[in-house]
Amino acid sequence: MSQVEISELAKEIRASLKQFPNFPSEGILFEDFLPVFTKPDLFQKLVRAFQLHVGEQKVDYVVGLESRGFLFGPTLALALGAGFVPVRKAGKLPGPVFTAEFQKEYGSDKFQIQKDVIEEGAKVLIVDDILATGGSASSAGELVKQTGGDIVEYLFVMELDFLNGRDKLDKPAFTLLSGQAEKLQN
């Protein structure tokens, strides 16, 4: 892995982000990474940075969390020669599913994964846009374990460090862009 190349790619990607103070609620600095997808070269750089990080590590599946993990998860899976598996909100997937509940800031939610899509012992990456409290990522990890998959690592574009979400994860986590160390000060 070329850490220097990953750092250079991260700088270019960070420069394209838009910031929105106090969105979606007071005290939050929302960093919108959607502009990355309006420029094909930046989108390719995002995928390339994650691909460089993963390196030669064998990956069978990339699991993307609804909904922003769906934006780059399939493209990363393709670049890695892996399959893509979605984790969705409850009631959105057909057939037999595993379900895991997780806590959000204002209540709880449920994620699901189809039961027959990941083979026992398959190597899995879990991807999402932001690591915040760690609840949704941890829930996705629980689902992968229920399928018999082996989590290799969690990958995120950004992290809200002050929420300590990585403490809820039982496997290594990589964040491409340096995170927010503290809550927005007004």
UniProtKB/Swiss-Prot annotation:
PROSITE patterns reported for this sequence: PUR_PYR_PR_TRANSFER
Catalytic activity: AMP + diphosphate = 5-phospho-alpha-D-ribose 1-diphosphate + adenine
Binding site for AMP: 132-136
GO cellular component assignments: cytoplasm; nucleus
Keywords, alphabetical: Cytoplasm, Glycosyltransferase, Magnesium, Metal-binding, Nucleus, Purine salvage, Transferase
Record keyword Nucleotide-binding present: no
GO biological process: adenine salvage; AMP salvage; purine ribonucleoside salvage
UniProt cross-references to InterPro entries, sorted A to Z: Ade_phspho_trans (IPR005764), PRibTrfase_dom (IPR000836), PRTase-like (IPR029057), UPRTase/APRTase (IPR050054)
Subcellular location, principal: cytoplasm
Pfam families: Pribosyltran
Subcellular location, record wording: Cytoplasm; Nucleus
EC number, as in UniProt: 2.4.2.7
Obligatory cofactor(s): Mg(2+)
One of the record's GO molecular function terms: AMP binding
Pathway where it operates: Purine metabolism; AMP biosynthesis via salvage pathway; AMP from adenine: step 1/1
Task performed by this protein: Catalyzes a salvage reaction resulting in the formation of AMP, that is energically less costly than de novo synthesis.
HAMAP family: Aden_phosphoribosyltr
Sequence similarity: Belongs to the purine/pyrimidine phosphoribosyltransferase family.
Cross-referenced NCBIfam families: apt, PRK02304.1-5
Subunit structure: Homodimer.
Stated name of the protein: Adenine phosphoribosyltransferase
Natural source organism: Debaryomyces hansenii (strain ATCC 36239 / CBS 767 / BCRC 21394 / JCM 1990 / NBRC 0083 / IGC 2968) (Yeast)
Encoding gene (name): APT1
